[in-house]
Structure formats: structure tokens, C-alpha cells
Amino acid sequence: MDTTSFNTDSFRDLTFDLLSGIANDPTKLDEFIDAYLIKLHERNDSDHLRKYTRDIYEKILTLQTVHTNPGFQLKDTFHEKIVVAYFWTFSNIHSSHMMPKLIGIDKRYSNAGVTVIGIHSPKYEHEKHKANIRHAIEEQSLPFNVINDNGLQVWKHVGCQIWPTVLIFGPDALPLFIFEGENHVQHTEIFLQPILNHYKSSVRASPSSSSIIKTSSEDIVANITTPKPAKFTYPSHLCVTANGQLCISFAGSNQLILCEIDGKVIEVVGNGHPGMADGEIQQVEFDSPHGLVEYNSCIYIADTNNHAIRVFDPNSRRVLTLIGTGRLGSDKIGGLKRSQQPIASPWDLCITESPFDHKTVLLISMAGQHQIWAYAFEETQWWNNVILQKNACLAIIGSGEEGNRNDSEPMSATLAAPRGICNGVMNGQPVLFIADSNSSSIRVVTLQNGNVTNLIGGDTDPKNLSAFGDLDGSGFNAKLQHPLGVAFHYSSSQLYITDTFNNKLKRVDMKTLACSSYFVTDIDTKKQRGELNSSKFNEPQGLTIFDHFMFIADKNNSHIKRIDLDHGTVIRCRFDLSETLNEERSFGSKQAYLAILLPDTFQLRDGNTGTWTIEDQDGFKICDGELTRYMSDQMLLDYIPRDKQVAHLKYELVICEDDKCTMMNGEAQPVNETDSIIEFVIKIDQPESNTN
């Protein structure tokens, strides 16, 4: 090795050699790691190593913080802790796969002197913005600290090549190991205890900032049996049932709701805690549910982080697991039956028919495997004389390699984290449309033979996954930015697309194959003063069409919106839980809502930003709670017994302009009250002065 310089390639070689030695004799893991660390400190190019260390450390210190826990100091952490620096970006499916491992490391090792720091390293323009990263942190409930490398200065200096990447630092910010890619990052945890043993005299093993805010084990056990209050966040997908009801999945609150088209909620499915429990709807658990589709009066659910397909039967009011083991799969062929078959990050679903015998199959966009899979409800014939066995699940489109290659042989084509999938018609032929998110394109699959082609977006180079933008047009000249949803309107022969990272809707006219931005007019008459314009979107995701209406999950706004396709108008859907069957608290009660209106340049402080208390006319507390930065513009606070006479809401909150924060307090009177709801508005005027 050239000892005149020390760089990331040096660490790649050292880490690879160490992993090879451990693979040959895993029983000597601790010995290998200890010997490696001793040699690292005794290298004859220590001056170059120190310079390499200092350059990385100084660049990290310049990054903007996005999410920090109480007491966290970046500089002190690097001197006193073992730091697991996790280079990730929230659009990347492989980064998502490793999040449970990083959260587990934070939970198990934070008291022992290990700190996890997420270094968000964006691919897309949309991902550079602090507010969008915060939404991703909140949706995924990330407990560790996150900083923003929005210019990729640390990413480039380290020489990162792939998401995710982990760089482990010893005390005094000395880089020790580098793990690149999903298959290698999973080794991170087995290295930590040997590292701690080696540096036990140098590491401050006091509780880290993230552990300070953790609840006790008794609290966790108690919470498991108690459904969370119905605060539905980060809606992801929707479907309309045969009897005209709307089902919505909420990735942030790990629940589904089944409601009438007018918003009256029939069922809330799931207790809101991330997990994989089957059973009755009050006890069932999901983990980031996404795509939905109905078949034979049951609703099929892509339970993404559980790597499973679940089934909700509204008649029995129960949920069971159909496909998946609950663990991340790596199989790219499949063929096993039901819950024996491991899968990876299913994202969306659609029901279609075999082109040969017209039997029904469930199609799954498997974002984690860059493929489309099929589940056969009964034995059926498929392309290339393949027989799909009853209850078996297997890959039918995509080699499993990430890419943008079109091919007449479906298993030779490559996809890039396919998300939305739907049926449609093109040139008179039944087809599938796929929102191929990481190639920023829409792909078309001819159902007759599996031929995979491009519709819009992407690039002619099958390895170019950075051909994104925001441009109307046809074919490769049209540009999208990480689209996540597709829905076909048969009456007008239009394909509607959620161009997610452009915060827009687009549509493709099947007669001209031209893609254009689709703008709508807000006619929402129920909007409160200061509420967002319903025609503005923030990471729109799933969408579904029912008659001439299109429903859209506007994820980061935590709204469901309804568009009248005949008139190009939009309203926000509002949900009435007053008669929900499985919410015992809703009987004889009304929902209390709060909206907070701030001056344009202000925002609520990150994390816990204040408290609220609702009192009766005698000044006695009816209910109370905390305010957080991530609550939507109109938040459901609690349920209030209808016999209570509400006088006002008292509040204390902290608002910030840049780095200057001010504590505000006061009272808010109800602005609207009916038998089912009571609404409050806190309006904050421009403060005269700010203090830190």
C-alpha cells in the first residue's frame, strides 16, 4: 500500500481484509478486531492518518443540524464516544432497510458510549431541504441525531459511493471501519462491543442524549395494549372498495381507516404501534403500511417495513398475514407459498388477470428487490409457459438488478425501486403502468407478453438513475423527480401521476403520449383562515380514481384530497370519527381540533414545543397534552365528553425565527363547536422582540 497518503480506499482495503479474516474464523472476532485497532494506531503513516481524520472531522462540524436530542453536542460526541456515522438519504430503499438496525444500535448501545449520527446525504434536489428531512425523521420515528450534508461535501470527501454507508469513529474522531451497501452495513453491530472493549478507558459511557428521552420498559409494555389516540399522520395510499367505501393507509401512524366517501369513519384498523401482530382490528399492528387493493371483499395491504402482505376482512374485523416472514428477504426468484416466502419492502398492489386463462392474480411492486412479483389465488398460466401455483408468490418482472433497462423478456429488464403500479390501456392493449421511482420514470408492461418499455422520464442509458427534473413533454424528454403513484382513468384515457419530489400532479394523454403538469383549483369552503391551499401538495404519494373523482394521499401535509376530474377542482377531505365502531372513546364525545397560525417567518421549535390544556367554565382541566413541531396545520388533540362545557384552551408554546426563540402563552376560545367537534385557533402576531 502507498504510505505517502491515507484515504478512504485505504480503509476499504483494511476493512475488507479484516472481514475476510473474520469470515475464515468467526470465533476469533474479538481478537481480530483488537489486533486491527492496535495496528491502526501503530501505522508508520500516522501523520497522513491524522490529516485524513482531521479533514473529515472539520467538515462534519460545519454541517447543519436537522434533529438533535437534548444535551447533544457534536464536537464533544466525537471526542468522547464511539460514533456510528450513517450516510443515508430518505428516498433510498436500501437506507430504509437498514434503519431498524441503526435504531436497534441506538437503543442497545447508547448507554455504553456509542452514538449514532445520521448524515443525510441527498440524491434529489427535494431531499436537500431541512423541512423535508424533518418529515422523513418524524414519519420513521428516528431516535438518533441527524445532520444535513446537503451539498454532499462530507459524502464526496469521504468518497462514499453508495447508500447506505457506515463510517465508525473511535475516540478523538479517528475513523476505524467503513461499511458500504446494505449487505455490509448489517455487520456494524457485531463490531461495537469489541471496539468498546478496546477503548474502555477512553469512552465516556454515560447515558447519551437519545437515551434520556426513552421511556421505561414498564411504559412500553403498558403502551402495547393501549391504542394510540387517533392522530393519523403521513397517509400513503388509498383504494375504493366495491361498495364505494374509501380505505386509507397511514404510514406515520401505522393504521388504516375505512370510511364512507363523505368522510364518516367506519373502522380504525390497528393500535398505532409499529409491529406485526395479527388479530382483531384493535390489537393488530402494522409497520409503515402503504399500497392497498380490494379483492373478494377483503383489503390487501403492502405492509412495507414488515416485508409482508396483510389482509383485512371488514366482515370479521380481523387482519392476517398472507405473504412474508416479517423479515427482510433477499430471494429474487420466489415460488414458496404464503408466509413461507420472504419478500422485501412491498410498496403497492394491484389486481389483474392472467392474459391466458383470465384467472386473478395479485401483483406486488417489490421496491426492495427492484422487481414486480405475483401471487396466485389459484393455479394459473403466465408468460413463457410459467405455471403460477396456487398460493405461491414469485418474481415475474425484473432481474433484481437496479436499473432502467427495457426488454422484451420481462425477467431481463431492470427496475429501480418500483413503487406505484396500476392497470391501464395503451394502443388498445391491456398494460401495467409502473412508477419506477429511482429512475424517475414511468414504465409500461404489456400484459400479453411482459414486454417492458418506457413511457416518460428516465434516460436511454439503463444505468443512469439521475435523469430527473421537472419538464413536460414526451418520452425521455419529459422529466419527473421520484414519482411514487399512478392511476389510470379509463373514461378519458389519461394516466395520472404523483410526481412526488416535484410536489406536483402530472398526466399522460394516451392518444398523444404527452405528459403535462396537472393543476387544480381549490374550492374548499370549509377551510379555516390560515389553512393551506388544497391545490398545493407536499410529497403526494398514492392516488386512486372512483368515477370522476380522484383521491390523493398528500403525505407530508397529512391530508387526503379529492379532485373532481370533470372540473379540475380540489377539496380537502375531512374525517368524522364520532361513530367509529372500534374507537370506544368516540362514543358520547366530540373531537377537539387545534390550528396554529404563525407569522410567515416563524415556525414552532423543533421537537416538544409547548403544552395545551382545555378547561371548563370553572377552570377545571378537561384534558391536556404536548405540542410538537411536526403536528399538521389542523391537529386532533383529544376526545371530550359531550356533557362537558368547554370554556377555553390555554397554551404555552415556543416559536422561532432562525435561531431566536420566544415563549408565548395565552388562551384560545372555541371558534366552532358542534355535537361532534370543537375547534380552536391559536393566532400568533409578530412578536415585538425575540430573546434566546
Predicted regions and their residues:
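N-terminal "domain-start" segment that seeds a small globular fold
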Residues: 9-76
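Short active-site neighborhood of thiol/selenol oxidoreductases, capturing the structured segment around
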Residues: 73-96
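Structural microenvironment flanking redox-active thiols in thiol-disulfide oxidoreductases
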Residues: 97-139, 150-155
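Thiol/disulfide oxidoreductase modules built on the thioredoxin-like
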Residues: 138-142, 148-191
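Gly/Pro-rich loop segments of beta-rich domains
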Residues: 205-236, 263-288, 318-347, 382-419, ...
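Residue-level detector of Asp-centered blade-edge/turn motifs that repeat once per structural unit
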Residues: 240-243, 294-297, 351-359, 423-429, ...
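Conserved beta-strand positions in repeat-built beta-propeller and related beta-rich domains
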Residues: 248-252, 301-305, 362-368, 432-438, ...
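Extracellular/lumen-exposed scaffold segments
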Residues: 539, 566-692
